[in-house]
Amino acid sequence: MKLLLLLLTVTLLLAQVTPVMKCWGKSGRCRTTCKESEVYYILCKTEAKCCVDPKYVPVKPKLTDRNTSLESTSAV
C-alpha cells in the first residue's frame, strides 16, 4: 500500500509541467525557437520569440497610390 502511494505521488509530481507563457492574445507561445509551421511576429518579455500560427498574424493592407486618387478629385 505504501509502495502504491509512493508511486502515485511520484507520478503526479512528474506529470506536472511548467506553464507555458502565452502571447499574441493567447494565440501564441513564447519559445526560443518556433516550430516549422509557426512564425514569430513580436518578442516576448523574456526575449523569447512569440511563435504564432500564420493564420493569426494580420496581413498588411496594400497602400493605394495617392497620386491617382488626387488626380480624380482635382479634375472636378
Swiss-Prot record:
The keyword Signal applies. One of its GO terms (cellular component) is extracellular region. It is found in: Secreted. Disulfide bonds join 23-50, 30-44, 34-51. Coiled coil: none annotated. Keywords: Antibiotic, Antimicrobial, Defensin, Disulfide bond, Secreted, Signal. Residues 1-15 form the signal peptide. GO terms for biological process: defense response to Gram-negative bacterium; innate immune response. Has antibacterial activity. Belongs to the beta-defensin family. PANTHER family: BETA-DEFENSIN 121, BETA-DEFENSIN 123-RELATED. This is Beta-defensin 121. It comes from Pan troglodytes (Chimpanzee).
